[in-house]
């Protein structure tokens, strides 16, 4: 039975770092369910303006007095340990007053109580797969509540309190917080070593997925992509525990190449510009393969959609309605998002600029593969990759792998490391990645000069893609502007 009534401790909350993707989503749901919300963050943002419009009291900067923004003060203070230090003055003041400090994952778990819970995790593709599942269920009339790590194109938001009986959310594995949840359906897209700054070893990272699956509710199911070796191994271990496993991936006659049975098989896939058409077969279906159309390119997107399809079917959504919903999925901000174009109307006379959140070698490889197919279908041109490494620890661990992945581009620009929460490491910079790139590459430590240099390298028909989890997303519009300026003044290079 669902209820809109909030737990008493969440009726009046103060959120430290309220503008973050995950925190702002929690704030939206709390406000929609009648809660009072105050918060603070380091800087203004579009998300903060939207929360203020909904009634949240938000202060820029961190100060102990922010705990008095709500009449009577908060019943709890919510934070995220990944980005907010324990020395934050608002957290210090909360502890002094005896106000409970609750981490975001624990709050999300409380908000899910009483609903059928579907959670998506994995090293790559979490946000996109979660968003696909949400859109599919919305199309089926289920109106799910949801919390996702990116802004969905259709909804223009990252969270929603729905009237339906299910809750869809992204489960973040980066800090072990996915162990707060007890899902009815868990989707695992892939497992590949990451976040060694937190886990310390590959074995510890892999183990958290096993622990997550073991938290499935009685009668729950694991939906897992067995094209990925790490996820396929998880499927085998999970089946040995007696948990129901629904596998999806490439194969024939209902089996993956490994011999594992498939609940959904990717029979064929074809990219058509920035769209894709896949043929899939569901277990037990004897008729011709089903056609799955997507408005987002890349074989990896087809696999993500298959995971969403199986999860939706698992809770009773009609197959054809789910496929119709997936066909209307417009993507997520920063997932192969078209930023802009400069030049003529034909692909051969224009430069297209995309932005992508890719910040792991495998993600970069998938994004550049989609770019390559796009170029092949539009008559040629070059791919230009602009990559900003994220975190010093990740850059140190994967510098060589980043270089190999970037070799799929025709030309590469590497920016300096976006450190986020980390302090610099001696000898680690964007140059650490650039030295492992074998195609033409330039290391650009000066972010402010990057847009002009990238624009100068482009020619009609080229595709530029900015990649990374930091502020490289700001660069795309600057590149588009620089391209247009160069074209207007007849500068050599881009659009002569």
From Swiss-Prot:
Assigned EC number: 6.3.2.8
The protein's name: UDP-N-acetylmuramate--L-alanine ligase
Stated family: Belongs to the MurCDEF family.
One of the record's GO molecular function terms: ATP binding
Keyword Nucleotidyltransferase: no
SUPFAM superfamilies: MurCD N-terminal domain, MurD-like peptide ligases, catalytic domain, MurD-like peptide ligases, peptide-binding domain
Transmembrane annotation, as ranges: none
Keyword Transport carried by entry: no
One of the Pfam families matching this protein, by short name: Mur_ligase_M
UniProt: ATP binding residues: 122-128
Keyword annotations of the record: ATP-binding, Cell cycle, Cell division, Cell shape, Cell wall biogenesis/degradation, Cytoplasm, Ligase, Nucleotide-binding, Peptidoglycan synthesis
GO CC aspect terms: cytoplasm
Disulfide bonds: none
GO BP term, example: regulation of cell shape
Entry-linked NCBIfam families: murC
Catalytic activity: UDP-N-acetyl-alpha-D-muramate + L-alanine + ATP = UDP-N-acetyl-alpha-D-muramoyl-L-alanine + ADP + phosphate + H(+)
Origin superkingdom: Bacteria
Role this protein plays: Cell wall formation.
Biochemical pathway: Cell wall biogenesis; peptidoglycan biosynthesis
Localisation per UniProt entry: Cytoplasm
